Amino acid sequence: DQINNDSPDEPLKQPAAEDQIETINLADDSVSNPVTEADGSNVETLAEADKSAANPLADIEKPVTDSAQKPNFFKRLSKKQLLIIAGIVAALLIGGGLVYWFVLKPDNKSSTNTTPVVTANKATPKAKPTSPLTGVELSDASLANRPVTGLMIENSGDARPQSGLTDAGIVFEAIAEGGITRFLALFQESQPQYIGPIRSARPYYIDFALPFDAGLGHVGGSPDALNDIKNLGVRDLDEFYNSQAYWRITERAAPHNVYSSFAKLDALNQSKGYTSSKFTPFTRKKDVPQTPTASSIDFSISSSFYSPHFQYNTATNTYKRSEGGVAHVDAQTGAQISPKVVIALVMNQGLASDGDHTTYQDTGSGKMYVFQDGIVSVGTWAKSSRQSQFVFTDKNGLTMKLNAGQTWISIVGSASYVSYTP
């Protein structure tokens, strides 16, 4: 705010020379306010009628102006005179303060005779864009608008080690058939150029892909899965009908040798009009590492060869994955798969009518375990329909927030177990 440019009040007019001296009447113990000469060069003093008298002011009829200030002026004043002078000074200070407050002080509320002050607002740091799939910050905002693509990744012994899993944003793990697990790996901002091996689809993997509005890359599927893909409007990227987006490597025998890249998958998505994905993301948060209470984690999904183990890494606040007693690594980078969040969803598990394929009751609700920041939180998962997103709540019914980064979700049958130790 600007100070009011109005001129202050005119100084008080000095009295005429003949009026500057007032007689101090000792009879009524009152003293008028001494005032300096107009030119400010002289100081008013009191003349003594009799220097030997006990009271130097007793016979004063008129004060005498002395051009030289005597050094012991205040010592020659009585206590009462000093009090009177102090009171006058205090009154002047108070009066001056009141004049400033009510007359000279700028009026912030008044728009009259004021100049608006233009204050440059400090630029608020712009929030960085984040991935809807993983919650991680992105260097390029356009990556957040990429379509989500899901790929069915095999996990048999002949398929290990796989390629591209370290780049997946979310991975769902469940049994395909015969106790052999399979992964649905979802990608958005990350674009690995060597992914596989890719295998066939199952109905519950479709239920995991639908809430993310994801394209589904697969090589055929069970009869029920193929019917669901057609009837539920899944974005179908089946290798059977889109072979230009896939290839087979010679280092592995069929059917463990189908691979793809995002250069090819992006072109396939574009050709089908799958340019973005609209979905409800999981609620994310920043890491808040705790004193570890759940560092060694085991899920009894199937036999030991397919039951994963996760070991908490305090340095990176991640969980290193192993299976069959061997570190689970990416074939392309050699890096061990290390998600930020590990989740076990407990579901009723059964057998399909063909007596071969596995089924899961993946709608409704059930118990869940969330491992992040070195601790475990027990809560509830809920999914109202095949197309709807999973909702994760804690023991108080509040939405559970997940660390930003890769999230690994294992489906654990209700007859199996989840174990963890500090």
Mark where each language-model region is.
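N-terminal targeting leaders characterized by basic, low-complexity, disordered sequences
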Residues: 1-75
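A surface/extracellular/periplasmic glyco- and lipid-processing/surface-interacting theme
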Residues: 71, 81-82, 118-170, 177-422
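Hydrophobic single-pass membrane-insertion segments
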Residues: 76, 80, 94-112
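Short, hydrophobic alpha-helical membrane anchors of single-pass surface/secreted proteins
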Residues: 79-88
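Hydrophobic alpha-helical targeting segments used for export or membrane insertion
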Residues: 88-94
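Ser/Thr/Pro/Gly-rich low-complexity linker/stalk segments immediately outside membranes or between
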Residues: 104-126
